Amino acid sequence: MNILVVRNDKLGDFITALPSIYVLKHHNQENKVIVCVAPLNQKLAEACDFIDEVIVDDPKSSVFRLAKQLRQAHIDLSVTLFSNTRVAFAQFLAHIPRRIAPATKIAQIFYTDRIKQRRSEVKMAEFEYNLALTKSAFPDIDLSYPQPLLKFEDAKEVYQEFATSYEISKDVVAFHVGFGGSSDANWTLDEYVVLIRAVLQNGKYQVVLTFGPDEQKLCEQMQKKLKGEDIVYYISKNGLVDFAKIISGFKYFISTSTGTYHLASLVGTRTITFFADTLFASAKRWKSVGELELQEHHMIPQKNLDRHLVFNIIQKKMQSI
């Protein structure tokens, strides 16, 4: 059976789909699992050994081109974890016999199986809603998956090359101060400076600040604020897979709830993560796919007094890790 899984939005969202993709593949090893992803996630999808084929949905191309790609894949069943009118209509045009998706938005009219999940109620995490949707296709499917879900044979070699090039000899505590996606709360850069210096004080770790390829200005801002400190500044320019291999060697990855947090959890790195104090952006919804014991979640309150109290707790945490 050829099974299509659609999750063609941002990095963190795609990572929440990976457990579902894994269980669909392992439900029957003869299944061919095809994913439809955004261009950003193509290389990461291709690195997963439980994904057989990757279809890249270029949002600038026509819906008819996407439908042609889907039709050529001879898909028997599709499971759409995130839907919009474009991908729904493309599947309809491709004549996929069975099309499963959450019963949301007008796009649901193009699916054969519309599943009521009410994700806005946040009764479970996003990746758990995704897993639950696979039950609609195969009621007896085993929803368990390995953690970490993604391993690389050459991860240690890539990390060692990174460590050698930056003369790193200690365990690494990494901070990723940028944010995007569903993350709508974060510490200010000056607050991050305080947290970073708290880690530096104990002398146990090498602090690394990581940045996306389009965050050069943010990197320069942090370099000015932390001038004279023993810090490695790393701008990821070699793609998500290379970045994931490097992250897998870190002791801690500290960030707001963004795609890189999910990437760190995916490869088994211990995370300390900051979430907005709202149900939509909370840890309850956006906890990641890795071992829960390796994830430490903190909500950033909206009120200044409460925010200050939580910040003091985090600062003490940074001094003691």
Question: Where are the language model's segments positioned?
Answer:
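Catalytic machinery of carbohydrate-active enzymes
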Residues: 1-321
